[in-house]
């Protein structure tokens, strides 16, 4: 009888410990997603920004599109990865005085593309990190809007994954 009680007490302690661990891990995951450690969510074709992009670039095939306020003017901007014959490209549609302009294309990964909006330099605007791969070669680049152009701040292996 004593052994049964001891086993029951141990089982209760283990269950309480597992429940506590689950709660701690859940909070940690929520903190990570709140701290910018997650990739941006892709927009669908029905999104108004995607439709506006397509109206100005009807010959482009969007692979993925993402939105955030890149230039810190209070209006959402669009980052689109578009399919190219030889190479994919990233084109930004940036808001300016209630209108939008399109940046020149920059190379983009061929497969498994992801975008993260981050504020590396702690100024008002956001930098855009693009990652992806081609045939198992992983690469990434960090871009910043400067004077109406997407400036490549830093990257690694983008030539191998584009």
Model features per residue range: what roles?
Residues 102-106, 151-159:
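Beta-propeller fold detector
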Residues 72-81, 122-131:
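Acidic/hydrophobic-patterned starts of short beta strands in beta-sheet-rich repeat architectures
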């Amino acid at each position: 009888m004593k052994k049964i009680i001891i086993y029951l007490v141990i089982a209760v302690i283990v269950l309480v410990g597992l429940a506590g661990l689950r709660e701690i891990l859940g909070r940690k995951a929520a903190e990570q997603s709140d701290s910018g450690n997650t990739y941006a969510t892709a927009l669908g074709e029905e999104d108004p920004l995607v439709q506006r992009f397509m109206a100005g670039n009807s010959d482009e095939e969007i692979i993925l599109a993402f939105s955030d306020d890149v230039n810190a003017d209070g209006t959402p901007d669009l980052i689109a990865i578009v399919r190219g014959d030889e190479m994919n490209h990233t084109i930004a549609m940036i808001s300016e005085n209630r209108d939008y302009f399109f940046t020149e294309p920059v190379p983009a990964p061929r497969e498994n593309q992801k975008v993260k909006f981050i504020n590396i330099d702690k100024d008002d605007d956001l930098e855009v990190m693009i990652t992806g791969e081609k045939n198992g070669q992983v690469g990434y680049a960090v871009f910043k809007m400067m004077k109406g152009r997407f400036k490549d701040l830093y990257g690694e292996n983008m030539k191998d994954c584009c």
